[in-house]
Every structure is written in structure tokens, then in C-alpha cells.
Amino acid sequence: MRGAFYVTTALLITNSIRTAAEANPPGRQPMSHHDGVVPGKSSPRRFLQGSHEPHDKFAVSAANEERMPEPSAKITASLSEEALDTVRKAAHFTFDLNAPPEETPTGMVEAYQVLRQKDPRTVTASHPKRTAEALTSLDEALGYANPKYSAGGQSKKLRTSVSFKATEVRNSISRDRMTPTPRTLSDDDVQNVHKLYMEHLERNLAVFAPTVGGRRE
């Protein structure tokens, strides 16, 4: 009797171990009860079906990159034109000296103004007389009166109203400032100013031309 009891107990223990092994196969981690999962039920899938890797919500697919719009050509052209206009204003010139003179009447007046306001000593230091002559010629071409100075060196302001062909100029001239308000220039006026201004530039180039061995190229 005692031997049969031992055999029955051993069989029960073996059966219990086998059942436990089948319920928890090797390699399976115990499930945490902190995930809100009821024991005995599988946890819900966290990823879409067919996805085996975590999803990066910040990733951009190649297809989306190809669909990204290119900068508008109109916007690019507008920004380019604004940049060029800023450069022109910074250089004090809004015209092309190589263009036909009849196409740049406003530009010629602006060129004259920039040139007239410059100190001759900073333009052609070694030839101030040439610079003065060029400025005088430009004054005559546009009909501007030359500024007068008193013996004490103080500038004497003049207010003149000059009619020059198809141009009426009202200007307030002082030693450091001239503010003309010209109307439309005739073709002859523009060509004269253009010619004189180009001659003035040629004089400057001749003065500052680089030399090689003491000889101008």
C-alpha cells in the first residue's frame, strides 16, 4: 500500500510539471499586468498590420519629397529684380551708359547730379583743372548756373529759373547741394550730356590707368 501511494504521488507531480511547461513554453516572457491587459489575453498590436518596425512620424518618404513644390519662377524673378534695384540705388546709377542716349534721359540727369556733387579733389586729385572744366561743360549743357562764392568762402545761394530748349530747370544751388527738378529733355540735350559725361569718364581712366615699367598701357 505504501509503495502504491509513492508511485501515485510521483505520477501526479510529473503530470503537474508537464502541464506547467506546456502552459509557459521556453523563451516566452511573463506578461506585465501594468499594461492594462487581462491575464490570459494577448496584448493589442501597437503597429499597423504588416509593419514590423516602429513608425517614425517625422520621417518623409521619397514620394513626398518628390511632390514638394519648387519655388515659383515669378517669385524668384521678383526677388532678383528687387536685389538688382537695390544694387543700382547703392551705386547711384539706374541706367546703362552703353545704352543709346535717347533711352536714358532720366539717367543722364542723375549721372550729372552724382558727378556734380562729388568733390573734384576726390575724383582726379592730380588734374583738378580737368575735372572743373568737365563739370563746367556739364553745367552749360544742362543750362545750370555756376555757384558763386563770397570772399569769405561762404556759399551764396542762388535761385534761378532757366529755360533751355524743351527743358525748364528750377534749382537751388549752394556749395554742397543742388536740387533740380527737370522736365523732359530733348534728344539733343540728352546726347550732349551723354557725350560730355563719357568724355569725363575717359579722362578719369587716363589719369588712373595702370602702368607697367613707368609706361601706360
Curated annotation (Swiss-Prot):
Family membership, please give it: Belongs to the RxLR effector family.
Organism this protein belongs to: Plasmopara viticola
Protein's recorded name: Secreted RxLR effector protein 147
A GO cellular component annotation here is: extracellular region
Record bears the keyword Lipid biosynthesis:
no
Q: Where is this region: Disordered?
A: 22-52
Q: Where is this motif: RxLR-dEER?
A: 46-67
According to its record, what is known about the domains?
Answer: The RxLR-dEER motif acts to carry the protein into the host cell cytoplasm through binding to cell surface phosphatidylinositol-3-phosphate.
Intracellular or extracellular location(s) = Secreted; Host nucleus; Host cytoplasm
Q: Where does this protein chiefly localize?
A: secreted
User: Which purpose does this protein serve, as stated in its record?
Assistant: Secreted effector that completely suppresses the host cell death induced by cell death-inducing proteins.
The protein's UniProt keywords, in alphabetical order, are: Host cytoplasm, Host nucleus, Secreted, Signal, Virulence
